[in-house]
Amino acid sequence: MHSFFGRLAILAAAFSFMLVAAGPASATPVASSATASKKQAKLKVKVLPASQASLLKSGVKVRVSGRPGSRVKLSFRSSSFDEGSRTLAKPRKIRLGKKARVVKVPATAGARAAASTCAARSLNALAVSGKQRARGSRALTRNLADCRLAPIDITQAQVCEFIAQPDQGNCMMPFPSDFYTRKDRNSPTGKRISFPVAAMPKNRNNVSIDPKNWNASDGFSQGQGILVKVPGIDTAEDVAANDFAPLQTLSRYAERNQRAVVINTKTGERQPIWVEIDANATDPDKAALMISPATNFDQKGRYIVALRNLVDADGNSLEAPNAFRYYRDAIPTSTGVINQRRGHFEGIFKTLRKAKIKRSELYLAWDFTVASNENNYRRALHMRDEAFKTIGDTSMGDNVVQGAAPDFNVTSVEDNVDSKIARRVRGFFTVPCFMTKDCASTGEFKLDARDLPERSDNDYQANFECIIPPVGLEGANPPKLRPFIYGHGLFGLALENSFSPVTRDLTADYESISCATDEIGMAGIDRFTVAVPALQDMNKFNQLVDRLQQGLLNGLFLSRLMHHPDGLGTDPAFQDGDGVTPGESVIDTDEVYYVGASQGGIMGGPMTALSPDFTQSALIVGGMNYSTLLTRSSNWSTFAVIFNPSYPDELSRPLVLNLTQMLWDRGEPNGYAHVTTDNPPPNTPAHNVTLQLALGDHQVSNFAADVMARTMGMKTNAGGIDDRRWPDYEDLWNIPRIGASEYPYRGSSMVYWDGGPYRLNPDNLSQDIGTGVPPYANVAPDGQWEDPHGAPRGASGPISMMNTFLQPNGFIADACNGEPCRADDWDGDFDSIIPVP
């Protein structure tokens, strides 16, 4: 202790000596005084606190200080997110005195108008004196009544996407939203769906949908319908008043002032869309505004939805929800659940600004992430790979048959069935089962740690029915028959193979053999055991989707059985002769093809995408995206009587259907559209598809088929659709026409077949024939019209076109000679039409 104070005394003495040696003490104070004087002379400007009310009344005040006597030029600007910088007040010139000077300047008329809005705004002043420049800035305090937001209900803010105020709509709307995602660095998108059970819709028994099957997804559907409740846009008239892009004129999505816009954040481009009100809602207050993609969203894409400058049917502006205004207008609040999302929304506004969409004009804006291709096909692809491994084929991308054929057993052989069926063969074939209950109709996947289906201990015995035409059995040396598998209709059965005009005509007239199996998941047995229970309680919906994927595998095994040299052709039932005595196989096993009609034309999409064997598929009256198809189908009324009472809230119904789409994507073409033709899944060949459609189809919406064609990159025949049939429709928008020099066309294609308008049959005036074009609203066509759904299956033109397509290096010809394609009972003569009274 003494040593420390001793050293301190020595240091103090040394410091005193240094001060004396340094000379007069007055030198240092003089220098400091000069520096202080110089600092005091520095030019400064400060914008004084200002509110909207004070600015509108008195203008803006600034405090200026600097060298006394100096002349200062002041200029005033204000800035906001949208405008950048604008003049706030006229410039002023002042002379400074010894004290700081407060200057008050009135705001310009434009500045007062801008300040009257609730947009966050900065008041900026620039002072210039000689070479000195000074700047000052202050945020404008927004105190007008319109900018003082009423409190919002945040009691459900942790589970509800609250920006549209759930008390005015639905907890999960707007939908889809990245509010319902979490980060997952192991997923292809970097995200994972995260629906809380408290947010999910409930059925009439107050049972919420369990989100576990949804939360495995890495994003929303690639064909996801967008839903939001906008009070004031409750009717078709309200929609029309906003000039949204309508279904009949899709090109309007790109209009500069379009009020509903969806932006691809990667490309900055607008997504083609159409906008409509839910026409199925009987209560306008429960009618959702619906936005649909006209071509599927990019896999793994992030999109921003922006609604702006909305009005009601009378032209009255609709004020944005207060919850969203906290973000749009940057209104301060101490509420944590609001503040924690500010950074996210600022990013949205910056992206929209690049797209020239003003923040101040927004009614609502939000974002969502789209699922990856892998998300949709990975389970079914895993099942395919594991199943084919059991028969010795692990290299399926080379389109070469390897390993053994699946086991099968013929159970019945019928000869001389009718004039077009010489032999009908039925039996069963063995398929690895990946469902509980040994693939019974109420089974579902048992998933492993990788979220992939585990194989059951027992195999599944799938049924088959095959028809052989007379040409394959007659004569001493009958031709080998081209094999194709047939996909049946809605909740149908394999036995439709014997009765479908397309199978009967293709086999009998074009030397083919057709086989079918029940498309389990949506086969006849599933109608009451799977579909109806799911409509009553969507917690069971995964059973339908899981079973559909098993059904895809069954179809792939049947095609291998037809394609393999050691397959069906090894049984006498598939050999020439009497069907019992061994003979020569009637099957040409070099190739195999797919033909599906109605539901088979739908389910043929994912089956084609996964197929290692058939690379050419004909999809008749097909389409995709069941959430779009259902309410637009004449079949829906049968199921709506079950679904609607089960989910009585009209606003929740379209949400429930769009939620199911996220699961349906694992087993229907909407989830495979990006990989069906080119860009196939791993270890899979590329494919070509022809889509043969009926104009005005009552069961499978033409609009959904058009989206499918755009997404898959199909082309259509030069004639397209007769303008006289659909004068107000921008038909086949963004679907390229096949040029004359491109025929025979070997790529993927779509062709509409027209059975003519609704009219009297000239050969029988007591009979109505023909149909109108489909309604633009999301409802089924007029039931009074004739349903053309079956026309392409029995018409000579489509059958001939499919025949040339279902060949090695197959093609479609210009069968309609550059004109719209017409079914057999319509010649295009509008002048001879006899109207229905």
What are these regions (language model features)?
Residues K437-A462, G475-G577:
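Cap/lid segment of the alpha/beta-hydrolase catalytic domain
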Residues Q543, R547-Q550, T615-P837:
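C-terminal subdomain of alpha/beta-hydrolase-fold enzymes, centered on the catalytic histidine
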Residues Q575-T631:
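Primarily recognizes the serine-hydrolase "nucleophile elbow" in alpha/beta-hydrolase
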